[in-house]
């Protein structure tokens, strides 16, 4: 967990576990230690006394001490407190103030966590419990020891610690598990329950480590990151076994929202069902995400909105499409420069318009309901919405779909190309070449 000479910040609450950890690391030697403490201010004078106790302990040991005072927002106090502590620890690591943050979680904490998550219906990811080492640099050296062993260590050395009165109350679910359910199950079913649950976490972590590599590979093949969203082909999901499809959906959710906070089995299952539905459309919700089905695509992301735009494009030049990283490039070309290829190639591949047929009042805007025109190759005018449906273009791609007009006439649209009445032909002298580019 530690390299010799590593800078290790120890998160110390003042309780038995963290006090034991600090003393043990001092005894171990060879590390550059510092002490971190978070005061949530929830217990008034007692919270301040905890902070003073930890500060004095650090001073006696000659260690740097960093105190963070936080005010918790509304909601689950236990959960918000944990998030505040982890945020502080991650900030210390990100700022380069330490190489590792050591926390005092024990095997007893592990057992409580696994049992709690099992009761809530967690899969193997949740049953993996508390990780001994995280990628961010948080380590838990006491994770193989039970709480009773920790307290015995402190009593033998006559080392004092602080007792948090809220740990004895019944208002928090974890306390009810710690003081009620877990001892009862151990007494009536399995005396070695703490060890059994810890082994369950170890087994689940190994499973998750294997699947992480497999899902990394599948994600690269099946998931596409877009602007504020992740896209999945429904056929890709349907080709997988249900177990793998669920894991891939979890990864897509994590990519789209940054974490899996608040996401449960039911959310994942609804996304899988949406992908498998016979209809090519539908919608469901995941905490923090809107999930839409359109034809053979799923989109997981923030809700997309249509943002109307109307621009005078640069000729020549590139005009960026608002809300996207795409742009429309326009270039005037003399006929002599384009005569080496048949005209139909230029019209279909490049989107060339006859400059003389244009009145010069060009406007670049997004598609609107009711828009219609006659693309080259069609015998009559068609609504662009119908073209979208024929080409199976997802609804979210249509919102900023570019249309080039000249006066009241649509002369070009993405994918469907030049209008028949404005397309360049053999008689054209100067042509307007259109193209789409990605703007970095």
Curated annotation (Swiss-Prot):
Cited InterPro entries: Lysidine-tRNA-synth_C, Rossmann-like_a/b/a_fold, TilS/TtcA_N, tRNA_Ile_lys_synt, tRNA_Ile_lys_synt_N, tRNA_Ile_lys_synt_subst-bd
Molecular function per GO: ATP binding; tRNA(Ile)-lysidine synthase activity
Entry keywords, A to Z: ATP-binding, Cytoplasm, Ligase, Nucleotide-binding, tRNA processing
GO biological process: one example: tRNA modification
Catalysis: reaction(s): cytidine(34) in tRNA(Ile2) + L-lysine + ATP = lysidine(34) in tRNA(Ile2) + AMP + diphosphate + H(+)
Record-listed ATP binding positions: 13-18
Domain of life the protein comes from: Bacteria
ATP-binding among keywords: yes
PANTHER family according to UniProt: TRNA(ILE)-LYSIDINE SYNTHASE-RELATED (PTHR43033:SF1)
HAMAP family: tRNA_Ile_lys_synt (MF_01161)
Family, as annotated: Belongs to the tRNA(Ile)-lysidine synthase family.
Recorded domain comment: The N-terminal region contains the highly conserved SGGXDS motif, predicted to be a P-loop motif involved in ATP binding.
Annotated protein name in UniProt: tRNA(Ile)-lysidine synthase
Organism whose genome encodes this protein: Solibacter usitatus (strain Ellin6076)
């Amino acid at each position: 967990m530690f390299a010799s000479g590593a800078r290790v910040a120890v998160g110390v609450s003042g309780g038995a576990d963290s006090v034991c950890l600090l003393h043990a690391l001092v005894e171990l030697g060879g590390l550059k230690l510092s002490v971190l403490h978070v005061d949530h201010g929830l217990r008034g004078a007692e919270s301040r006394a905890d902070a003073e106790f930890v500060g004095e302990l650090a001073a006696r040991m000659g260690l740097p001490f960093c105190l963070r005072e936080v005010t918790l927002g509304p909601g689950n106090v236990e959960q918000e407190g944990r998030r505040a502590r982890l945020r502080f620890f991650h900030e210390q690591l990100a700022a380069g103030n330490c190489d590792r943050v050591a926390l005092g979680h024990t095997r007893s904490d592990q057992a409580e966590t696994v049992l709690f998550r099992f009761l809530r219906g967690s899969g193997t990811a949740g049953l993996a419990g508390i990780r001994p080492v995280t990628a961010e640099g948080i380590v838990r050296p006491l994770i193989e020891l039970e709480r009773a062993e920790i307290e015995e260590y402190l009593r033998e050395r006559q080392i004092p610690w602080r007792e948090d009165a809220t740990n004895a109350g019944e208002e928090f679910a974890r306390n009810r598990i710690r003081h009620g359910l877990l001892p009862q199950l151990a007494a009536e079913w399995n005396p070695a329950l703490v060890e059994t649950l810890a082994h369950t976490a170890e087994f689940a972590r190994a499973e998750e480590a294997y699947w992480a590599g497999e899902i990394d590979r599948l994600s690269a093949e099946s998931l596409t990151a877009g602007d504020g969203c992740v896209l999945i082909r429904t056929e890709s999901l349907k080709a997988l076994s249900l177990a793998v499809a669920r894991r891939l959906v979890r990864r897509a959710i994590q990519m789209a929202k940054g974490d899996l906070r608040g996401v449960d089995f039911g959310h994942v299952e609804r996304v899988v069902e949406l992908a498998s539905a016979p209809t090519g459309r539908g919608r469901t919700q995941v905490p923090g995400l809107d999930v839409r089905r359109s034809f053979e695509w799923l989109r997981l992301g923030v809700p997309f909105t249509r943002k109307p735009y109307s621009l005078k494009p640069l000729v020549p030049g590139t005009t960026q499409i608002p809300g996207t990283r795409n742009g429309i490039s326009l270039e005037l070309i003399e006929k002599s420069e384009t005569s080496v290829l048949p005209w139909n190639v230029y019209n279909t591949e490049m989107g060339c318009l006859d400059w003389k047929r244009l009145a010069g009042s060009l406007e670049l805007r997004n598609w609107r309901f009711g828009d219609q025109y006659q693309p080259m190759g069609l015998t009559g005018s068609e609504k662009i919405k119908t073209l979208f449906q024929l080409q199976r273009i997802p609804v979210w791609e249509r919102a900023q779909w570019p249309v080039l007009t000249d006066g009241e006439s649509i002369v070009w649209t993405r994918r469907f190309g030049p209008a028949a009445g404005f397309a360049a032909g053999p008689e054209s002298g100067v042509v307007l070449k259109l193209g789409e580019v990605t703007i970095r």
